[in-house]
Amino acid sequence: MKIMKYIDKFRFFHWLLLFGCLLCVPHSVQAQAWDGEGDIKVYAGYANVGGRSGIELGSDYALSDYVSVGGQVTYVNVKDYDEGRDRALMGYDLSLMGNYHWAEVLKLPSVLDIYSGASVGLRTAGLQVGVRYNFSEAIGVYGQVRQNLFKTFGDDVEHGRVYQGKTALSVGLTVTF
């Protein structure tokens, strides 16, 4: 038990140090959540699809100041409770998406980007809306809500409703290249 107490203290001081470092980042840097044409964003984070936890990894490429295209892989944990085994391949969805970025239209601060769009994946197709906030020129956070509307190409006989009709929430970090 004593070891756990020290580990918890270590984690607390680790997060405190990280938070302190973030506060020391110069605020004079021109952080932009959306640079427009040629901008590349890579993001990764926690995903929750209909109550199932997982991870998400994706990228956006800006075609213009308003439109981007990209791809995304989402994986959620799918467990077959009847047989007690994981069904790893049933939990993924690979999607292509297109987004419209509202920053210039809404005259938002350059550190903030609000977007909406559509996606088509191996399991489902849907609509999404999201927001990005950049702390620095390269690093930021994002949050996204996606409503998976209908089934597409995936053959999910046993787990057909992992994505279909479910709301997906995701939060994480974004990196600009």
Task: Indicate residue ranges for each PLM-predicted region.
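Solvent-exposed loop/turn segments connecting transmembrane beta-strands
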Residues: 44-55, 82-90, 117-128, 163-164
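Repeated loop/turn-to-beta-strand initiation elements of outer-membrane beta-barrel proteins
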Residues: 66-71, 105-109, 133-141, 151
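Membrane-embedded beta-strand positions of outer-membrane beta-barrel proteins
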Residues: 42-44, 71, 96-98, 114-118, ...
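Short glycine/proline- and aromatic-enriched beta-strand/turn motifs that initiate or cap beta-hairpins
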Residues: 27-69, 96-98, 103, 120, ...
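Outer-membrane beta-barrel "beta-signal"
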Residues: 94-100, 164-177
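Gram-negative outer-membrane beta-barrel proteins
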Residues: 48-52, 77-83, 104-108, 124-126, ...
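Cleavable N-terminal export/targeting peptides
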Residues: 1-37, 177
